[in-house]
């Protein structure tokens, strides 16, 4: 298995320098969910110019960032000038000509100096970006599809790690790892290798991302018992974080249970999804019934095109200026912390 393909993963990198006449075979397996519609699969073979793609994103990222700045901000005015000068250097009369590539090189050199060297490196605010995939073990699909989806998603991560040496990834739910171990032991070994490198983080505390409203106290304890034991035995790591991005509510006894199970930190999202009685804190100490305290953080990441005033935040953040800048704008505890989680 090479990787998964879906609406967010539309490309498969085949080879860096293919030779004329080389043949590549690719087998596809598809699943349409509960929809009974007819879908048409269209495949194109593309040649990617890495320098051209880099120049595109180096221009696009600050351009999208402008939309979140006030019109009279000095940084915005300077950025508009730098972007205008960069675009004016491009010769678009004959794309892919010698003159075109020379102009792209000149534009890239200019934006690197004018934007990324002179305006970049602002360290008073930090966005810690964590690669992550959220998979529901039980939702609108069969358990067999969960098994397959786990393998596809983890294969995609391993493929991205080959292409991007600086890419780091975190994933919870030992149950998903057990699916991969059963179906693709060779992939599971590659995951273990990445864990040893420090690029793959098996973390999350529980066996699955469990409901915490209806679940009994004993069941919650066993979630931690089975989850922490699996990650310790399989990867040699001791979980300290309860990672529940997609759960809607929590028992008041949970801080006590977490403390007793060796959990020090808690991350969630949906407690901040109230439209009217908005939760006043994003980073705080959650005190349980017995007085146990757990450091808790609510994700503040915004979706692409989403306003700061929206009550909705997402644990499926895109690496986009709207998510990063919007996440800081949305964060309510700037006086105690300058590092947000994306």
Residue ranges and their predicted role:
Residues 1, 5-342:
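Catalytic-domain carbohydrate-binding cleft regions of carbohydrate-active enzymes
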């Amino acid at each position: 298995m090479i990787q998964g393909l879906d609406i967010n993963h539309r490309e498969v990198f085949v080879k860096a320098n293919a030779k004329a006449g080389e043949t590549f075979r690719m087998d596809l397996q598809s699943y349409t969910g509960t929809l009974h519609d007819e879908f048409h699969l269209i495949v194109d073979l593309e040649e990617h110019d890495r320098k051209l793609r880099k120049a595109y994103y180096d221009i696009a990222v600050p351009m999208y960032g402008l939309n979140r700045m006030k019109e009279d901000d000095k940084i915005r005015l300077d950025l508009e000038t730098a972007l205008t000068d960069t675009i004016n250097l491009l010769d678009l009369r004959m794309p892919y000509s010698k003159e075109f590539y020379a102009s792209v090189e000149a534009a890239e050199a200019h934006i690197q100096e004018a934007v990324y060297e002179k305006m970049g490196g602002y360290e008073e605010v930090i966005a810690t970006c964590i690669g992550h995939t959220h998979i529901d073990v039980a939702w609108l699909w069969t358990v067999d599809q969960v098994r397959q989806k786990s393998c596809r998603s983890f294969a995609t991560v391993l493929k991205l790690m080959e292409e991007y040496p600086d890419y780091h990834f975190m994933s919870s739910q030992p149950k998903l790892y057990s699916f991969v171990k059963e179906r693709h032991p060779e992939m599971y070994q590659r995951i273990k290798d990445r864990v040893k490198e420090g690029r793959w983080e098996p973390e999350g505390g529980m066996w699955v991302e469990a409901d915490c409203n209806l679940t009994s106290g004993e069941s919650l304890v066993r979630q931690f018992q089975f989850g922490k034991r699996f990650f310790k035995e399989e990867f040699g790591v001791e979980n300290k974080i309860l990672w529940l991005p997609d759960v809607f509510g929590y028992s008041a006894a949970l801080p006590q249970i977490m403390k007793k199970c060796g959990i020090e930190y808690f991350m969630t999202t949906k407690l901040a999804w109230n439209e009217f009685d908005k939760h006043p804190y994003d980073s705080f100490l959650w005190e349980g019934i017995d007085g146990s305290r757990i450091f808790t953080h609510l994700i503040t990441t915004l979706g692409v095109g989403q306003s700061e005033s929206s009550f909705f935040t997402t644990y499926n953040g895109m690496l986009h200026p709207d998510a990063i800048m919007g996440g800081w704008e949305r964060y309510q505890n700037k006086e105690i912390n300058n590092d947000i989680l994306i």
